[in-house]
A protein has these predicted regions:
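Accessory terminal helices/loops
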Residues: 24, 236-238, 249-319
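Active-site HxH/HxHxD metal-binding segment of metal-dependent hydrolases
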Residues: 88-166, 170-173
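N-terminal signal peptide c-region/cleavage motif recognized by signal peptidases
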Residues: 17-19
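Metallo-beta-lactamase
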Residues: 70-72, 78-80, 173, 180-264, ...
């Protein structure tokens, strides 16, 4: 049942900056192809990089599963415009209604498109971890939206905040439209609110931003230890197909490669911390050690910040 307090949230708040008129709306998102990764399972692989004017804020991997009586959608995207594009791709493949949406975590590039799905299917169940729902109530969605508005120069304008109305917790097993889904959760991973969704029958695992491929994102909202633990949990599954939050779908090499990055960075930071180096002093040494990742999108933008955050984490572990 939908929680009573969540009916209050669904008195949907328009997310616009104070300088943006309510009537304004960003342009439509062009169609991106839905790539078949397994029978009845599709991923719309978004462009890599940060939100921008060029990508209109769309840069994640919306995915959907066509069940026997409906469609299940994972992380529909960053705006109402993205959600409308995702629905267009679904309708090219199925006339069934969207009956459930899963949001992997709090970052709005994955869930602000809920609005378009809710507009088309007002009774749709939207799942997220309880920690995500709490963070929405604390205003994390609003803050992320303001960033999207700035970085896209208003391309996401007109988007409404439609948060999850159902909770999904670690170990939950659901059957929706004939599809079995198993929920995995590791606290303090990429964002403190990250669920991963396993399709055990298809041996598929949706990783959310616990894993990225060929792209480095921010780590300000989580921890290295928790993110590493989440990937190790993912690799304990029987999945053969792994779908990251950003980047191309693949096999075990997808989570294993990102695990290599996080583990190597954290290990190097701890080593140089013991040697008495500051984060600034160790940074060029670690960047050289991680040179195998230097062709990843946003490596230069984020690796220094990652080193500083890992330094603080190592320091905190001493107390």
């Amino acid at each position: 049942m939908i929680n009573h307090y969540f009916h209050q949230l669904l008195a949907i708040t328009l997310l616009v900056s104070s300088t943006t008129a309510i009537a304004e709306r960003g342009p439509a998102i062009p169609d991106y192809p839905a790539d078949r990764v397994a029978e009845n399972v599709y991923v719309i692989h978004g462009p890599l990089g940060v939100p921008s004017v060029k990508n209109q804020g769309f840069m994640n991997n919306p995915a959907f599963v066509i069940g026997d009586k409906g469609v299940i959608l994972i992380d529909p995207g960053s705006s109402v415009q993205t959600g409308e594009m995702v629905l267009r791709q679904i309708r090219k493949l199925s006339e069934l209604p969207v009956v459930a949406v899963f949001n992997t975590h709090i970052h709005g590039d994955h869930w602000f498109a809920n609005q378009a799905i809710h507009d088309a299917y007002p009774d749709v169940a939207i799942y997220g971890h309880e920690e995500m729902r709490k963070l929405v109530l604390k205003g994390e969605g609003q803050r992320f939206f303001e960033t999207l508005m700035r970085m896209t120069e208003g391309a996401v304008a007109g988007t409404l905040e439609v948060p999850p109305n159902q909770s999904a917790a670690h170990g939950d097993e659901l059957t929706i439209a004939g599809v079995t889904l198993h929920i995995l959760f590791e606290p303090k991973a990429h964002s403190y609110s990250d669920i991963m969704i396993e399709l055990p029958q298809q041996r598929i695992l949706f990783l959310g931003d616990n894993v990225m491929s060929k792209r480095l994102g921010q780590m300000d909202s989580g921890t290295f230890n928790g993110n590493i633990a989440a990937i190790e949990l993912a690799l304990e599954s029987r999945a053969e197909i792994y779908i990251p939050g950003h980047g191309r779908t693949g096999g075990r090499e997808v989570p294993e490669t990102y695990l290599d990055y996080l583990s190597s960075l954290k290990t190097e930071v701890a080593k140089h911390f013991e040697e008495g180096l500051s984060d600034f002093e160790m940074s060029p040494l670690i960047v050289e050690t991680l040179s195998r990742f230097s062709d990843w999108v946003d490596f230069e933008r984020n690796v220094g910040r990652h080193i500083s955050l890992a330094y603080l984490e190592v320091e905190a572990e001493l107390f």
